[in-house]
Amino acid sequence: MDKLQKTLEEWKQMLDPEQYNVCRLKGTERPFSGKYDKVKTDGIYHCICCDEPLFDSTTKFDSGCGWPSFYAPLENSAVIEVRDMSHGMIRTEVVCAKCDAHLGHVFPDGPPPTGLRYCINSVCLDLVPRS
């Protein structure tokens, strides 16, 4: 996969302020505030920055954490997991493999079959419904 590279200024022109803060500056939207937290529409969730397909709605579940949660990415190659030691915690950050957008974090407390919970900011996603 070819990486999509832009300067921070280019991203700032392309994204709204909240998208820029979360996707490029590694911010986090408030829990239960994102538009996809409770959505059950069948489709594919794409990266808001580069339109790369990231998650399938069939792997989405209600974790109760306030952010959309998935037990697996669409393809393992769609995301990259990075050790995150910010805020006095050790976590695993999830970024888009194509454009390095910060998406959220993955935790080992999800349902079968993976036991993982990809906790993703709604503002980083664009849901494309299946026809």
Curated annotation (Swiss-Prot):
GO terms for cellular component: cytoplasm. Zn(2+) binds at C47, C50, C96, C99. One of its GO terms (molecular function) is peptide-methionine (R)-S-oxide reductase activity. Its EC number is 1.8.4.12. Pfam families: SelR. The active site is at C119. Binds 1 zinc ion per subunit. The zinc ion is important for the structural integrity of the protein. Its cofactor is Zn(2+). Residues 8-130 form the MsrB domain. It is an enzyme of class 1 (oxidoreductase). Belongs to the MsrB Met sulfoxide reductase family. This is Peptide methionine sulfoxide reductase MsrB. The lineage of its organism: Bacteria, Pseudomonadati, Pseudomonadota, Gammaproteobacteria, Pseudomonadales. The gene is msrB.
